[in-house]
Design a protein with these regions (language model features):
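Beta-propeller blade signature
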Residues: 116-129, 189
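Acidic/hydrophobic-patterned starts of short beta strands in beta-sheet-rich repeat architectures
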Residues: 92-109, 169-173
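Beta-propeller blade termini
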Residues: 82-92, 159-165
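Short consensus segments that form the blades of beta-propeller domains
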Residues: 44-45, 109-117
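Acidic, small-residue rich beta-repeat scaffolds with periodic aromatic anchors
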Residues: 30-59, 132, 137-202
């Protein structure tokens, strides 16, 4: 039996690698991205620019840095990236809430295991003028712990897997893979000023 020579194998491997890159590029182009800001009253928006969250006016000018507790301020300063699952606030019982995912690098060594990965935590912030008060937090993605948000086969940003629900008021989170659990859907219902896991409404 003849064995393919090394040049032939190299050509096949290069073609396969090129096909994979083209496929990934096509998926990236088709992906529905997460919002880069959250709309608030008066044409303003909340955006992240390292190391803080800012209130940005209609012209794009930063007007005010949101005041947050020290622990969240440190998390934002150390973040590798920040994402907004929804482009709008959610008003519940007369109070406005904001969803934000703060990511940090999985590994301080870029060439190590999970060096390019991230560990993400969802925060639900209650807005009080220029203050943002965390009312709930939840780890939602992790390279180290094999936790990944749903992407609909790569067609959408993983942050789109975190959504507001109207009735009952709360947050739906869908994971493509939750360690030792596979695909998972959980609901966090608003109650007494915070959010707690509850049965997923039918």
């Amino acid at each position: 039996m003849r064995t393919p020579n090394s040049p032939t194998i190299a050509v096949v491997l290069k073609a396969a690698a090129l096909a994979l890159l083209v496929f990934r590029a096509a998926v990236a182009c088709a992906e529905t991205p997460a919002p880069d800001s959250v709309r608030i009253a008066g044409g303003h928006a909340i955006e992240w620019e390292r190391p803080k969250l800012f209130d940005v006016d209609a012209s794009g000018k930063k007007t005010t840095a949101l005041r947050v507790p020290a622990a969240l301020r440190r998390a934002l300063a150390d973040a590798s990236s920040v994402a907004f699952p929804s482009d709008h606030l959610k008003r519940i019982d007369g109070t406005d809430y904001l969803l934000v995912v703060v990511n940090r690098s999985s590994n301080s060594r870029p060439t190590g295991y999970c060096g390019a990965g991230e560990e993400g935590t969802l925060y639900v912030l209650e807005l009080r003028g220029a203050r943002a008060v965390p009312r709930f937090s939840l780890p939602v993605q992790s390279c180290l712990d094999s936790v990944s948000l749903e992407t609909d086969g790569g067609a959408q940003s993983p942050y789109r897997a975190i959504t507001w629900r109207d009735a009952p008021a709360g947050i739906d989170v869908r994971w493509e893979y939750l360690a030792h659990g596979g695909a998972t859907h959980r609901f966090y219902r608003f109650a007494n000023g915070t959010f707690a896991e509850a049965e997923v409404p039918r």
